[in-house]
Amino acid sequence: VTSPVATPPRTRARIRHISALDGIRGAAVAGVLLFHGGHLNGGYLGVDTFFVLSGFLITSLLLAEIGSTVHVNLGAFWARRARRLLPALGVMLLGVAAYAALIAPPEQLHLIRMDALATVAYVANWRAVFSGFNYWALFTAPSPLDHTWSLAIEEQFYVIWPLVVTGLLAMGRRGADRSAEAVAKRILVTAVVLGAVSAFLSLAFYSWYGANRVYYGTDTRAFAILAGIALAALIALLGPVTARRPRLALEVVGIGSALFLTAAAFSLKGQSLVLYRGGLLACSVAAAIVVAASVQPAPGPLSKLLSIRPLTALGLISYGVYLYHWPIFVWLSPARTHLHGWPLFVVRVAVTIAVAVISYRFVEQPIRHGWRPAIRTGVVYPAAAALVVVALLIGTAGYRPPPHGAVTTDAATAAATRAR
């Protein structure tokens, strides 16, 4: 599953495209949309599925590169991540800047400004931790950037994990010690140990600091990414499951895991005690099992179900859907649209998908696969980021603190919801 295609030495290694993984993305982002629309209690668990997928895919790519070149080209890896993630993020932030300048209430501008700066720096999750933001009250006084905490955790992973893999590769001095198999063994041990530490911290910090620290912390959510990492290492070591009985067993367990995740999505509310007493970990392991069953060469019933066109089509644009949906949901509020319930949800989702498709077709794909700047990427992206920051600062520049004692209702609500 994770073997690179035949490539000359020192070229980029690839892994084969698997439609079922697009379907998993589609199901995950659909859950998030339904949760933020107020129609699925546990739809937020889609984020954990994204974490598992990221750990699996990135580690598979790194192992494929090691197998092909006995090397990890960090600069090329980070450049690919930048081309994949930053253009759409910049477009979203420019949209938020326009919203702040033209629509947002004045008392919200400072909040948006600080959220935007944290988003650009990919530390939004830690801003949420240290500001005391309660995620489960985000519908009360929403910022259009409340959803970027998970993007921050992903980006931190993209920066740190390739360095760890490079270090694990360097532990082998020569020959077989530097093979993809040898590195996969080290990755597996590392993932299991760090995953256990992350799970322990999640349990301990919930007792010490409460749910928000656990929900937002990189250290307390890392076990989901590490579950995907461990799966990638296992598949690299063991290969695909081809024998009939083990394949059937994996399919049955995979279907059971998918049903478990579905039940959790319908029943597991965000402040449920079980969520922080092993529930998030169990859902991450279940997601990893679903991925394992879906990537086998001979498609089974689960893989075929996840490969249906509506899910895979949504999965292809899932990054844009996730990125744009929350600012659009905040903009298309009941007060502005005079809609409620399912009619409001349908309008919000329709606009989100339209924007995501346009972004995918005219921003993300051209930059990712075709267009290359005439000057170095190391100049283009920092310059673009600086322009986005300037636009955000200008868009949120109208804030003035209200006179003493004259706090508006929105401001009071925001202050109660977020100790910022």
Model-derived features with residue positions:
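Membrane-interfacial segments at transmembrane helix termini in multi-pass membrane proteins
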Residues: 370-383, 405-413
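Membrane-interface segments at or immediately adjacent to transmembrane helices
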Residues: 394-420
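Generic short amphipathic/hydrophobic targeting helices enriched at N-termini
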Residues: 1-2, 403
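Internal/C-terminal transmembrane anchor helices
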Residues: 375-402
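Membrane-interface helix/loop caps of multi-pass membrane proteins
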Residues: 2-375, 381
